[in-house]
Amino acid sequence: MTKAEMAAALINTRSLPAGLGWLQEQATEARAYDALNPYPAFHFRDWKSENRGPLPRCMPIAKSVINRGAKWLFGKPLQLHVAENTDLETFLRDMWRKNKMGARLVAMARAAALDGGVALKFSYDETARVPLSIQSLSLVDEVRLFYDPHNCDEMLMARIQYSYFDAVAGKTMWYREEWTAEEEIHYYPVADEALTISPGSARVYMSYSRTNPDTYEGWTISSQGANPFGLIPVAHIKNVETDDLYGTGDLWDLYRVLDRVHLPIT
């Protein structure tokens, strides 16, 4: 089977990318520490045997480290250089500024530290006020990246899906589009209540207790055609590069150490 055939077989699949469940669990734990939530009981199941009453809230150690790291990395604007093409350099710098990337990078770095990375979706419309649009997407919630099972650097298909409020319809809707190197696929929006009541949507996000649109059988393709770019316009940026699909968050390996600091104090 060719890579194009493998990618085509993934269109509108109800299967999830390998490792996504693991990533969601890791990100949920990291977000709990960052939001200074009370500790979920399962955090202690492997070593906390004594009963000390109500579980304590997370101290702001992890949050402070991540905030400082993000500001250190992207507190100063990046400079884009295209030595062999000054016109392209001027255009990219203008698009970078109009997409407010200088301010957004700090927030993206914080999100990547918690989720293990971030995805950037690029769109081009020469008639738009900002022809080159850069959209940042959560690897946990808003994008599904399917890779060649034999090469974790070869992306076969990217699915972008997220909820939004439709003011005309007066309800929350779900948006979906998919990309392979050969095809661009768009779907009709789906109302949130359709996902909630569908028997095919029984699976829920373990971390967020909400319906998973990946399992919904009612998605209908509204348009499907050739990819005008010849490549998938999604960049997967890992927070820390590792030899797997998703990389790692800044403090994933240290949260259990922080537990041992928090509990004696609280």
Positions of the model-derived regions?
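Extended, charged amphipathic alpha-helical segments
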Residues: 209-266
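Extended, helix-rich architectural segments
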Residues: 1-155, 163-165
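Generic hydrophobic, helix-prone segments enriched in Leu/Val/Ile
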Residues: 69, 108, 112-113, 176-177, ...
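A recognition module on extended beta-rich or small alphabeta surfaces enriched in W/G with H and D/E
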Residues: 169-185
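A short, polar/proline- and glycine-enriched secondary-structure boundary/capping micro-motif
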Residues: 142-146, 167-174, 219
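Extended, non-transmembrane interaction/recognition domains
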Residues: 182, 189-201, 205-216
